[in-house]
Amino acid sequence: MVPVIALVGRPNVGKSTMFNRLTRTRDAIVGDLSGLTRDRQYGEAKWQGRSYILIDTGGISGDEHGMDEKMAEQSLLAIEEADVVLFLVDARAGYTAADQMIGEHLRKRNKRSYVVANKIDNIDENLARAEFSPMGLGDAIPVAGAHGRGISQMLEIALREFPKDEDELEEGEEVEEVAEGQEAKRIPGPSEKDGIKIAIIGRPNVGKSTLVNRMLGEDRVIVYDEPGTTRDSIYIPFERNEEKYTLIDTAGVRKRGKIHEEVEKFSVVKTLQAIKDANVVIFVMDAREGVVDHDLNLLGFALEAGRALVIALNKWDGMTPGERDFVKIELERRLFFVDFADIHFISAMHGTGVGNLYQSVQNSFKSAVTRWPTSRLTQILEDAVSEHAPPMVGSRRIKLRYAHLGGANPPLIVIHGNQVEKVPKSYVRYLENTYRRVLKLVGTPIRIEFKGGENPYEGNKNTLTDRQVNKKRRMMSHHKKADKKRRDKR
């Protein structure tokens, strides 16, 4: 399961700055997700092969209204749900009464908590550690979030007990796994043994649990016509046509302002974790409501996580032809950014169209985890460049030399060349569409990463032979004598 890290602390200690710096490492900020209070944000980040979910909580002032009330309103849920709590304090302001109250609460919860002394610029680190030692949460980790100082040490401590992502490939592995001349091959991994993990996600009351029951053929998940019936993510293994699957039924993510019970607030993290844990995401929408903004938020997170995607419009039965045509137009207009995903019009209640989901799941999973040899990917690149060359940069043209596979689920294609940092986004989209069309990729995002040409001798110090050293000395002596003669003539 993807670990969850919560940032807590008083107002203005740098939590949001830290949140932006950490999530910007993958440009995967997911701000203002529904189901969050006004001052909380959820984001996804990755550090040294470890993905994690980050929560930016509201500031806790510890004023006269009491610590418990503030914690319940802003940060208690994040602390309870988190695997690790980073307790940010202001090294400049020093140890305050509010810090003491927050520290006492964390000790009572028996959570893995670390004190992070932020704004350490021009402050003695040893003094900062001593300042916050009375809280009893270990030595403070000195950082300067605004400038990135100490961030690596903080993440190393926070994530050291969590393994690297399962689909992380070691450098160079992509070239050796597939022999030249072999067209493609399926990447072995946990999914081959345990079955394809499918996360069923969507807003509350769109029919996710009904769909799970229909796919299983039995009532395994309690279903009521009440949003938020499913309180936690439920993992259900099963087999169909000798294929293994595991369905993950997630609690519905409620719209902000409609959450009243603590247990439903937890469902936001559970949904995000389920997306990261899945191989394929089936995104369920209510056809009668069409595409709403909250659907786009959830789709955005699934895309940032790089998961294969299948879209199911539920409650299609009972709609008039005119209503169906309107919904299809809305889908084309608002879901253009996921045009690679199969869309199914289903009725989970009556089973119409549900069986077709399995083929899309299989196709999406295969596209997400298939590996191609370097020669194949490079040939596609050469054909694409031949048909439509990269633009000129000044008087020089961008050169793209070769490509190889850098990862799977989603497929990551690494392209090497010169001036690659100047490749425009429009050309990146052209390459993505070309690879998707030629490789017949369906249902999965595709990512392209560029690497510039590197000097293989950079950093190598050339050791001179004795003969070269003597020659260099003679030449330097000759130049000195020549300079002296020129000065004497003047």
Swiss-Prot record:
Designated name of the protein: GTPase Der
GO biological process: ribosome biogenesis
Stated role: GTPase that plays an essential role in the late steps of ribosome biogenesis.
Gene that encodes the chain: der
Sequence positions that bind GTP 2: 202-209, 249-253, 314-317
CDD domains, per database record: EngA1, EngA2
Segments of skewed composition (Basic residues): 470-490
Chain positions recorded as GTP 1 binding sites: 9-16, 56-60, 118-121
Domain KH-like: 370-454
GO terms for MF: GTP binding; ribosome binding
Quaternary organization: Associates with the 50S ribosomal subunit.
Organism annotation: Pseudomonas savastanoi pv. phaseolicola (strain 1448A / Race 6)
Record family assignment: Belongs to the TRAFAC class TrmE-Era-EngA-EngB-Septin-like GTPase superfamily. EngA (Der) GTPase family.
Pfam families, A to Z: KH_dom-like, MMR_HSR1
Highest classification ranks of the organism: Bacteria, Pseudomonadati, Pseudomonadota, Gammaproteobacteria, Pseudomonadales
Top-level taxon in the UniProt lineage: Bacteria
